[in-house]
Amino acid sequence: MLACLLAAGLGGCATDGQYEPRSPAVSPPPVRATPPPTAPPTALPRPSPVPPASAYERDGRTLLNRLLPANIGDRAGWTTDILAALTALQIPALPENLCAAIAVIEQESSFVADPPVAGLSRIAWQEIERRREKYSIPKLVLDLALRKASPDGRTYRARIDALQTERQMNALYDDMLSELPGGKTLFGGYNPIRTGGPMQVSIAFAEEQIRQRPYPYVRRDSVRNEVFTRRGGVYFGMAMLLDYPGPYSQMLYRFADFNAGRYSSRNAAFQDAVSRLSGRTLALDGDLLRYQDGVPADGSSETQRAIFLLRARLRLNEAEILRDLKLEKSPAFEHSVLYQRLYALAEASSGAPRPRERLPQIDLKSPKITRQLTTEWFARRVDERYRTCLARGPVEA
């Protein structure tokens, strides 16, 4: 029952496992003195033409050690997990890529694998009371439920009082779901914790990522729980940040995408062009369609309706417009007929090139956030850290 009380208010919270080594390249077969007369073995594919593993790893470690902030705990462990993620994702260990990851980790967790959330216990209790009143649950019934011993030996009340991290909250929720009466019936398949780990990556993204690309570690637990480990949080966070073809002139826009969703900076610029052509004021949030729980929802968005007003000038009908808008979360959108014709009209109207990138205008909302923050604030703050990191790197000749 307690799981119900926590479910609504803790979603969208924004802020270590042991590394199991994985070779970044295939080792050559051993030399045989008298090989049998067999056909030559088929060469195994290599992910990219990188230097030999030992030199590549040594150079990457040297560079990363120089770029990491001075005073972080378990420097060797962070180095191992960051380089392992790059290798698994086949992303080169360049200063730009390393510093992008470093900047996000520093912003989201200050290099703490399971970062504390200020006031998490207070937030939990406030939501428990709100839900108790909403569902008319007698206070005595709730108090009795919270006195029940949980699997770790403490009562649920004691665990809520001691909450400090999202990983603890996630484990508490799992225990309540399986142990408290009615938990599975009421809340099976739902968990209020939606982000986690040192890069505060979306659990939904991690679950999708593992469907697209094999996870590089031996996994003994759920994808959700892997996000809360250092190795998993770094891997999924770096995938979210770097493992897609962002059409941007600066890393700044990837930082905005990390916060708002992939291609949000590209799409916000597209919305601005639509707004200027149609004369309609639009929220430049990077979402061209309406979404619910991460999937397109019924009903037209404001952006969609504004584009429909331009359909004669675009020489596209509503079905064709919707077809192309459904590509908005992929690189294919910028090659669509809608995208090309819309920008051609916008540039003909203004007499000047229109930007293809823009920081989304989104207010950040979470029980953890106690002041007004935006996606633009996040992106610029991370970009400052990114540039500071680059300044610690080697000077080009």
Predicted regions mapped to residue ranges:
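Cell-wall glycan-active module
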Residues: 13-397
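Sec-dependent bacterial lipoprotein signal peptides
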Residues: 1-11
